[in-house]
Structures are given as structure tokens and as C-alpha cells.
């Protein structure tokens, strides 16, 4: 491998297999690359498949700055309720829903678009009192997590499968923290028949697309060939404005000093930006602050994450 393992830095676009937890995938890649510093962005349920962004090396510090938008292909089964809000759990209620039509369902989907209040599943990775909710639930301690506001940008109907327990296939584009299992449950409740998630594929996450993802077997093969397909930070963070520093400025900034910058337009306060050196090398993430009230174009670039 051309990259030194000790200085490896970047992201991998993993197609998570079904039956694996997100942590299982991280552990596998740690063993594969023989490094400890590996993390992931956006937990996927074990039964789900699709895009799982993997951060390698110091790129783990950049995970909070990746784009939040996610896209899913979800299949919802109606007439069935489970304790996990998917088919992996215990069935709590089951009944015929063969009277439902797409014409009945379509208008209800609008209630799930925009800023919506959502209660996460009782079986989830949310922490409460230092414990994951799924850990408590497995011990019989079912805790209803507090509701929270999430953003759903779009819901498109992909297919409809009528029957005793009809299934609805949707494309859902949303922000971080949105539980598709909760949408399945709540849609079923609105229809009065119950609902649960039958299948979930994440097609986009943190700017990475399923069409360009690689399986664990693909990654293992490419790693052995010395061709690990790392996505460099500049590309993964292309949604952020880039600010270039001169060599003296870069040295000071990397030592933790703020740098005064003059912009033709005022940048938003606290905006995160990519910071690069004059040769284009990625230095880290900075934050914009305004200090000169008389000239709001004069701002400072505060070190947020320094990688150089």
C-alpha cells in the first residue's frame, strides 16, 4: 500500500451488509487496515444495508462536518406492529389491511414532510442514563424516548404491493437523526392498521452514493492490491467553503492561532470552512468569527480541527 498506515487519512464508502451492526463494520476495517482509529458516520440498523461512511485515521475528527442529508429506499408493511418497529422484533399485533389503497395513503404522506416531531423507536442506539435504549429494551426495560424535531425533505412513492399485509415502497430524503422505522410505525397508526419497516436500503449518506460504494470483500481485495479507495477530506467536505492560507499564516493557524482574513463579502458567523495551505494541502476545519464591528468584512479564522 502506498499510504503509510500511521498517516492514513480519509473516508471509505462502505455498502454495509445485512446482519452486521455499524460497529461490526468498524471492527472489521480496523483489523483489515491494522489501525485503531476508525469510525463511522450515521448508524445503520443491523438489518439495513447500504451506505455507511467510514472515517479512517484523523478523518474521524471530521465526521461531524460531513453533509447531513441522507436518502433511503424503504419498504413498509402495513397491518403489522412490532416492538422494534421493524420485522426483526416481536409481533405485537397483526391484522388484515387488504382494504387499503394507494389513494388513501398518498395524502397522509404529506404529514411526514418538512420539520416534523418524531418519537424514536424504543429499540434504538439513543443513550439515556449512560445506556443505549436497545440495551435497556433487551432487559425488558422499555423506555419511551422523548420526541424530537427532524427534517424530511421529500417522500416519493416507488411501488405498492396490495394484499393481506400490503407493502409500500418509498424513497425518503431526510436530515440526520431521522428514524425511518418511526415513519413506518406512525404511518400505520394514522391508517389505523399498524405498520412496521420491512426493508431498508440507505442510498445516500454524508455526500456518498450507493452506486459508488464498495462491499467489505471489495475493500479487502483492493487493500491487498495496495489500492485502498480512500476519499480525501477535500472531496468529502466539498460542500464547505475553502479558505487558503499563506505559508506563514498556515504555520500560525496550525499552532492554534486565529488568523485575520479580509473577504469581499461577510461570511456567516460560526460558519465552518475547509482550510488549506498555499500548495492546496488540507490543514483542517476553521470557524469564522467577526471581531471588527466597523468593518464586518474583517473576520478571524479560528482553528476548530487542526490535522496538519
Curated annotation (Swiss-Prot):
InterPro entries: PsdUridine_synth_cat_dom_sf, PsdUridine_synth_N, PUA_sf, tRNA_psdUridine_synth_TruB, tRNA_sdUridine_synth_fam1_C, TruB_C
The enzyme's E.C. designation: 5.4.99.25
GO biological process, one term: mRNA pseudouridine synthesis
Keywords, alphabetical: Isomerase, tRNA processing
GO molecular function: RNA binding; tRNA pseudouridine(55) synthase activity
Catalytic-site annotation from UniProt: 45 (nucleophile)
Enzyme's top EC category: isomerase
One Pfam assignment: TruB_C_2
Family label: Belongs to the pseudouridine synthase TruB family. Type 1 subfamily.
HAMAP family found in the cross-reference section: TruB_bact (MF_01080)
Role this protein plays: Responsible for synthesis of pseudouridine from uracil-55 in the psi GC loop of transfer RNAs.
Protein name (Swiss-Prot/TrEMBL): tRNA pseudouridine synthase B
Organism: Gloeothece citriformis (strain PCC 7424)
GN (gene name): truB
Amino acid at each position: 500500500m502506498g499510504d503509510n498506515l500511521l498517516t492514513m487519512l480519509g473516508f471509505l464508502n462502505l455498502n454495509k451488509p445485512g446482519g452486521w451492526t455499524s460497529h461490526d463494520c468498524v471492527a472489521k476495517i480496523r483489523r483489515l487496515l491494522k489501525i485503531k482509529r476508525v469510525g463511522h458516520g450515521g448508524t445503520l440498523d443491523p438489518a439495513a444495508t447500504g451506505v455507511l461512511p467510514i472515517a479512517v485515521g484523523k478523518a474521524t475528527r471530521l465526521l461531524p462536518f460531513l453533509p447531513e442529508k441522507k436518502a433511503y429506499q424503504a419498504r413498509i408493511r402495513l397491518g403489522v406492529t412490532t416492538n422494534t418497529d421493524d420485522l426483526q422484533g416481536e409481533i405485537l399485533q397483526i391484522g388484515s389491511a387488504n382494504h387499503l389503497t394507494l389513494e388513501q395513503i398518498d395524502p397522509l404522506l404529506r404529514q411526514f414532510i418538512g420539520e416534523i416531531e418524531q418519537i424514536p423507536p424504543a429499540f434504538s442506539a439513543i443513550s439515556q442514563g449512560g445506556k443505549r435504549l436497545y440495551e435497556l429494551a433487551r432487559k425488558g426495560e422499555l423506555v419511551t424516548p422523548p420526541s424530537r424535531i427532524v427534517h424530511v425533505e421529500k417522500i416519493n412513492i416507488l411501488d405498492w404491493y396490495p394484499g393481506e399485509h400490503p407493502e409500500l415502497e418509498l424513497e425518503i430524503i431526510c436530515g440526520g437523526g431521522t428514524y425511518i422505522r418511526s415513519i413506518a410505525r406512525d404511518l400505520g397508526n394514522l391508517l389505523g392498521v399498524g405498520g412496521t419497516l420491512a426493508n431498508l436500503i440507505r442510498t445516500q449518506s454524508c455526500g456518498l452514493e450507493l452506486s459508488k460504494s464498495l462491499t467489505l470483500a471489495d475493500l479487502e481485495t483492493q487493500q491487498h492490491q495496495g489500492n485502498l479507495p480512500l476519499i480525501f477530506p477535500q472531496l468529502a467536505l466539498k460542500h464547505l467553503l475553502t479558505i487558503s492560507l499563506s505559508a506563514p499564516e498556515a504555520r500560525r493557524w496550525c499552532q492554534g492561532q486565529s488568523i485575520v482574513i479580509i473577504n469581499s463579502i461577510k461570511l456567516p458567523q460560526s460558519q465552518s470552512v475547509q482550510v488549506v495551505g498555499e500548495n492546496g494541502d488540507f490543514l483542517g476545519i476553521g470557524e469564522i468569527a467577526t471581531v471588527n464591528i466597523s468593518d464586518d468584512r474583517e473576520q478571524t479564522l479560528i482553528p476548530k480541527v487542526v490535522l496538519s
